[in-house]
């Protein structure tokens, strides 16, 4: 266990639990919820989807890495904060109250048990492998529940004008670049190598580096091995290179044809002093 994931929660908690049945049908474990007594009934609404989240993420990434131990959630006094302490996620008290509104946070912190807790970053320069992956997991869960519309809606909510800088060795370890640009770069990688190769890469990367540490280059090597694609340019442009926002201007022309109309759109990258960026 990484030292930053160690925590002790202490309070006059009341608790309840679900039981998760592992993918192989043999292993099972409790998902236990520890809440302040005054939030006990409301928390059953807030945490109602955790069992489904566990099943869904296990199906996407591979079995929950700590199924021989446990998973749980503990309410703590950090207002709107949350932390993926290993096997017991801390959830700020402001999230608890029967709101059924903070699913993204719950998915994000659970996803860290694959990306960050089980497969840890080799250095803090590789923090994208934690936070970008956990943020994209929110979109993958939305896709699993609501199809492509859910995926698109969730990714649109992650769009920010603060994508400046690199994902590798970022200036702000826990800024929007790492989280939101990180999720978008994974989304782009998915379309660069295709769904089959992308999800197989996630499985292989998890299996290969489970309970150890990995770097961006380790992840890149797995993706290249699975897809048979040279990803040097993709990683150089989107992960190692820091830029201002890459914007586009456009012109269009509509011409009448025998069968109707034909529209020609031309996109121009701005600013133009960067190399031409490749979009899948």
Q: Each predicted region: which residue ranges?
A:
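Short amphipathic, basic-aromatic surface patches that mediate peripheral association
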Residues: 267-276
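Soluble non-cytosolic domains of exported or imported proteins
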Residues: 40-51, 97-101, 105, 124, ...
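Acidic/His/Gly-enriched intrinsically disordered linker/tail segments
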Residues: 125-188, 192, 209
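Amphipathic alpha-helical substructures
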Residues: 175-265
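Hydrophobic helix-coil surface modules that form long, contiguous segments used
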Residues: 1-107
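Zinc-dependent metallopeptidase catalytic helix centered on the HExxH motif
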Residues: 51, 90-150, 202
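Active-site-adjacent structural elements in folded domains
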Residues: 74-76, 92, 97-101, 165-174, ...
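Active-site-adjacent bridging/hinge elements
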Residues: 25-30, 82, 108-113, 154-168
